[in-house]
Amino acid sequence: MNLNNLENIRYNEIKEFSDKIKKEFTFFQKKQVMDIIEKLNKDPRKNVIKLGQALEKFLNKYEEELKRTNNMYNFDRRYGNNYLIAGVDEVGRGPLAGPIVAAAVVLDLNVEEMQRIFNIKDSKKLSEKKREELDIIIREKAISYNIALVDNKTIDERGISWSNNEVLKRAVEGLKVKPDLVLSDGYAVKNLNIRNEFIIKGDSKSISIASSSIIAKVYRDNMMKEYSKGLNMYGFNHNAGYGTEEHVQAIKKYGPSKIHRMSFLTNIL
């Protein structure tokens, strides 16, 4: 759209163009967008000025997210630009029911800036919808990923500490490529025959760990929703097996199901 004669262009057309910029921002140069904002802000119409202000706010937010994303990529790249780095994280350590799940993800850390995956962060800080969207993108862009689980019966037999380490180990060992380095969240993975560095609050610092956190959570949440179809009295579709008041009361009323961790229910039954 040619904005040289902006005063002759209808508001609705300008708004459509503004919305297109936001949707297809990667196809525009930053300077080009800044020039458009300047023209919109000089228009005598208040509603057009508001479009310029909204576009400027969008640009600032995008710049902040770009910086945050680059920091997460650079955190992993500091270990070596030519390294294959896997991030690994688990979800489901604390629930009363269901498996513990881990994912390992190897990303291309040297992709061009605009090809990087934006909005990646600790899965707990994302909405369910955003996690689902990012799960698809991560799987598509990953060099390799693998999801592993340890079921409730094994958790009861071997204990949660063993199961937690085992599921992380299985996730890494199931990758189709062998990484040079494994980054884990919070603590080291024992008995792993690959160099391993653990990162405190890794899912907020490392793009690889945060990515693994997201696909592990999406996988487990969807699994618990499937279980809920035959065990709807426990509310697995929204509590994911965690010990909410509703869940605890259901256990007391109906007893445990086949996917409950009996070793976690000693204070309930």
Curated annotation (Swiss-Prot):
GO MF entries: manganese ion binding; RNA binding; RNA-DNA hybrid ribonuclease activity
E.C. number: 3.1.26.4
Cofactor(s) the protein needs: Mn(2+); Mg(2+)
Location (main, coarse): cytoplasm
Superkingdom, natural source: Bacteria
InterPro entries, per the entry: RNase_HII, RNase_HII/HIII, RNase_HII/HIII_dom, RNaseH-like_sf, RNaseH_sf
SUPFAM superfamilies: Ribonuclease H-like (SSF53098)
Catalytic activity reported: Endonucleolytic cleavage to 5'-phosphomonoester
A Gene Ontology term for the protein's cellular component: cytoplasm
Keywords: Cytoplasm, Endonuclease, Hydrolase, Manganese, Metal-binding, Nuclease
Annotated localization: Cytoplasm
Domain (RNase H type-2): residue spans on this chain: 83-269
Cofactor: how and how many bound: Manganese or magnesium. Binds 1 divalent metal ion per monomer in the absence of substrate. May bind a second metal ion after substrate binding.
Protein family: Belongs to the RNase HII family.
HAMAP family in alphabetical order: RNase_HII_B (MF_00052_B)
Protein name: Ribonuclease HII
Lineage, opening ranks: Bacteria, Bacillati, Bacillota, Clostridia, Eubacteriales
